[in-house]
């Protein structure tokens, strides 16, 4: 599970970019809840500190909006942009969305698609401008509000991000991803109790939401309640058994409660599942060191 919420972080990840598509497909994410584009790389931790993986901000809805406008040529270029997003050619996708907007400046879907694609490549200022352009056309669009919140959070404007997520929740109180996103942002402001409340709400609304349980586990660890955190990590792991980051955090939580054999087992699974990339090297090294410690005779 990547560190961060849009999509994925979140959500984000999206490093990994999760692009949720209204077409019903889910291509790989390049942000999220690892460090997402536009985020600073995590600072080194003391050798005896358990690594903590940051939450992922997710998108409220699908990352690419189906065109609803009638201009056939603008729609064609928007569709091409969506196709290039699927292909992973974000530069060409951006060109197509811009072409659509040259043909039809008030094309809401193209503004929103362009905004999210710019955010995926780390062009936060340009992305925010496009989100705001989309909202001028459709001020009540909740997806645009949520995704603007994600962009603002990644830019460090936590207050602005919270305002956007709360706008979503005023109109749609049952939005699980908006609760997760708000929780992540509140945690970033130091409001751990507020974050816990949002994660618990998300988990109660959607018991099978992996990010809600994972984020709740992380917050409970920070709150000093490892037993409850372990329960949340186990729930998340049941939903996604091959998620390396869940196993890493579960292993560290188990080690912290003296469950050495179980902790070692989870860390071995993490090392088996995690990709050996520069972004993951820090976590891999710390997991290897912790596993050696756990395997030493008492």
Question: Model-flagged regions — what are they?
Answer:
Residues 2-5, 11-70:
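Long, contiguous interaction/recruitment modules in multidomain scaffold/adaptor proteins
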Residues 36-65, 256, 260-298:
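Terminal, low-structured helical/coil segments at or just beyond the last alpha-helical repeat
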Residues 54-59, 87-99, 109, 120-133, ...:
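Structural signature of tandem alpha-helical TPR/SEL1-like repeats
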Residues 75-86, 109-120, 143-154, 177-188, ...:
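Conserved alpha-helical positions within TPR/SEL1-like repeat arrays
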Residues 214-276:
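Ankyrin-repeat and related helical/solenoid repeat scaffolds used for protein-protein interactions
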């Amino acid at each position: 599970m990547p560190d961060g919420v849009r999509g994925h972080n979140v959500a984000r990840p999206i490093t990994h970019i999760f692009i949720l598509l209204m077409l019903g497909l889910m291509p790989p994410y390049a942000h999220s809840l690892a460090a997402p584009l536009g985020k600073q790389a995590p600072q080194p931790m003391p050798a005896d500190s358990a690594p903590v993986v940051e939450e992922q901000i997710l998108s409220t809805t699908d990352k690419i909006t189906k065109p609803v406008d009638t201009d056939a040529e603008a729609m064609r270029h928007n569709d091409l942009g969506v196709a290039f997003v699927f292909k992973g050619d974000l530069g060409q996708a951006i060109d197509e969305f811009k072409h659509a907007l040259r043909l039809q400046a008030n094309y809401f879907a193209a503004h929103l698609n362009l905004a999210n694609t710019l955010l995926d490549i780390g062009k936060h200022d340009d992305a925010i401008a496009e989100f705001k352009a989309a909202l001028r056309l459709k001020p009540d669009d909740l997806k645009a509000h949520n995704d603007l919140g994600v962009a603002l959070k990644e830019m460090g404007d936590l207050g602005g991000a919270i305002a956007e997520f709360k706008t979503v929740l005023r109109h749609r109180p049952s939005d699980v991803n908006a609760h997760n996103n708000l929780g992540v942002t509140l945690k970033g402001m130091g409001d751990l109790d507020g974050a816990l409340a949002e994660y618990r709400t998300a988990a109660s609304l959607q018991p099978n939401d992996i990010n809600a349980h994972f984020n709740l586990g992380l917050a409970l660890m920070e709150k000093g309640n490892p037993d409850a955190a372990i329960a949340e990590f186990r729930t998340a792991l049941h939903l996604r058994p091959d998620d390396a980051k869940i196993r890493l955090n579960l292993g560290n939580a188990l080690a912290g409660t003296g469950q050495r054999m179980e902790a070692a087992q989870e860390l071995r699974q993490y090392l088996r599942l995690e990709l050996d990339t520069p972004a993951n090297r820090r976590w891999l090294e710390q997991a290897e060191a912790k596993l050696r410690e756990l395997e030493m005779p008492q």
